[in-house]
A protein has these predicted regions:
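Active-site-adjacent substructure of cysteine-protease-like catalytic cores
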Residues: 72-132
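Noncatalytic regulatory segments and standalone regulatory/sensor domains
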Residues: 4, 118-179
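Stable alpha-helical elements in mature extracytoplasmic
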Residues: 7, 12-19, 53-60, 75-79, ...
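Residues that form generic nucleotide/phosphate-binding pockets
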Residues: 38, 42, 64, 82, ...
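Active-site-adjacent structural segments surrounding the nucleophilic cysteine of cysteine proteases
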Residues: 1-50, 103, 119-121, 176-179
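Mid-length scaffold segments of soluble, non-membrane domains
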Residues: 45-46, 50-73, 84
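Sec/Tat-exported extracytoplasmic proteins
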Residues: 15, 19-27, 61-65, 83, ...
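Mature, folded catalytic cores of secreted/periplasmic enzymes
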Residues: 12, 68-69, 108, 125, ...
């Protein structure tokens, strides 16, 4: 999704906006439903000169009463436990040409998207990819192995967790990775 003044580099605030809108619909808290430019304004790092600062994004979500943290996962199995509790995971990935079939852009040195589920065949992961050209192309299926390579080789399994305080989450000792 391309936005004026932010364009294709707003993947982090766009993903965060998606997750906050999800929690707005789940909790009925309309204050969580923020437009992407609003989230981008709230997450902009003037030193970095961009919106991809992970702690800035989680801090922004926290200002609305959500629990938010940057974590390192070591497996997609850990992510499956969060998804089973209804918590989407915002993952930082990178890949080269031909390494992530079906991606809306051919390659990226750093891209954030939302893991929203796993296909019943176990071989594909369901994501919302903010690089899509328009809302209709945001939901995508990626090959599980290709996605894992893009995530673990790219960022070492870095992800944001954002969810309401008091939400039933997985046992942290087996689900949060090494952070």
């Amino acid at each position: 999704m391309i936005y004026p003044n932010g364009g294709e580099v707003w993947c982090s605030p766009t993903s965060l906006s998606m997750v906050m809108a999800y929690w707005s619909s789940k909790t009925g808290n309309r204050n969580l439903n923020k437009a992407v430019p609003t989230v981008a304004d709230g997450t902009y790092d003037y030193v970095y000169r961009g919106n991809g600062n992970w702690p800035f994004n989680t801090a922004y979500a926290s200002t609305f009463g959500l629990k938010a943290s940057v974590n390192r996962f070591s497996s997609l199995g850990q992510v499956e436990r969060w998804i089973s509790k209804g918590v989407p995971v915002l993952a930082s990935i990178s890949w080269g040409r031909g390494q992530l079939d079906g991606a809306p852009i051919p390659a990226s040195n750093g891209h954030l998207l939302v893991i929203r589920g796993f296909h019943s065949d176990g071989e594909r992961i369901i994501v919302n990819d903010p690089a899509a050209d328009g809302n209709s192309g945001v939901k995508r299926l990626y090959d599980r192995q290709q996605f894992a390579a893009a995530w673990f080789r790219g960022s070492g399994g870095i992800a944001y967790l954002v969810y309401p305080k008091g939400w039933n989450i997985p046992d942290e000792t087996s689900s949060r990775g090494s952070w």
